[in-house]
Swiss-Prot record:
Gene name linked to the record: rps4
Name of this chain's protein: Small ribosomal subunit protein uS4c
Cellular-component GO terms for this entry: chloroplast; small ribosomal subunit
Cellular compartment(s): Plastid, Chloroplast
Keyword Plastid: yes
Gene3D superfamilies listed in its UniProt record: Ribosomal Protein S4 Delta 41, Chain A, domain 1 (1.10.1050.10), RNA-binding S4 domain (3.10.290.10)
InterPro entries documented for this protein: Ribosomal_uS4, Ribosomal_uS4_bac-type, Ribosomal_uS4_CS, Ribosomal_uS4_N, S4_RNA-bd, S4_RNA-bd_sf
Family: Belongs to the universal ribosomal protein uS4 family.
Length: 196
């Protein structure tokens, strides 16, 4: 399967809030269609929805998600927690968390267009895995700084996770440590994704 490029609000109505996919929210009364199926959900459907939440939030293909599950399965710790840590330490997600991009697809575009430096080197791979003590900055040119400047001014510093720090004057972010589970901004049961 390729990356999803269709209407985002349809996915949000079906799966719930996905802050990495879009800032938009559905209208409160828009999902009042009468559903005639029973209230009981099958286990397969629940697991599939959790997997789709993860895929659409982080902007992954099916193959990428399977690769991350495989890597997390080899770890000695909890597979679900390691999976979330791997996904949260991706460069595109860290840019989104720092407030340098409004959504994860927007962060992917910044990385693909070579506006982002990691430890002084240009990185154009959105799935680049950041490590603790990595310094993430923009290029020195005015265009790159202008793209990030407006977004950083409008972002709320109180929402910044504890594993990241940001210097808004120099447009610089620092990865302090690997993320804790409680700072993941998505309501998801990661064990159901691993079971799927």
């Amino acid at each position: 399967m390729s990356r999803y490029r269709g209407p985002r609000l349809k996915k949000i109505r079906r799966l719930g809030a996905l802050p990495g996919l879009t800032r938009k929210t559905p209208k409160s009364g828009s999902n009042l269609k009468k559903k005639f199926h029973s209230g009981k959900k099958e286990q397969y459907r629940i697991r599939l929805q959790e997997k789709q939440k993860l895929r659409f939030h982080y902007g992954l293909t099916e193959r990428q998600l399977l690769r991350y599950v495989h890597i997390a399965g080899k770890a000695k710790r909890s597979t679900g927690q390691v999976l979330l840590q791997l996904l949260e330490m991706r460069l595109d997600n860290i840019l989104f968390r720092l407030g340098m991009a409004s959504t994860i697809p927007g962060a992917r575009q910044l990385v693909n267009h070579r506006h982002i430096l990691v430890n002084g080197r240009i990185v154009n791979i959105p799935s680049f895995r950041c490590k603790p003590r990595d310094i993430i900055t923009t290029k020195d040119n005015q265009r790159s700084k202008g793209l990030v400047q407006t977004l950083m001014a409008s972002s709320d510093p109180g929402k910044l996770p504890k594993h990241l720090t940001i210097d808004t004057l120099e447009y610089k972010g620092l990865v302090n440590k690997i993320l804790d589970r409680k700072w993941v901004g998505l309501k998801i049961n990661e064990l159901l994704v691993v079971e799927y």
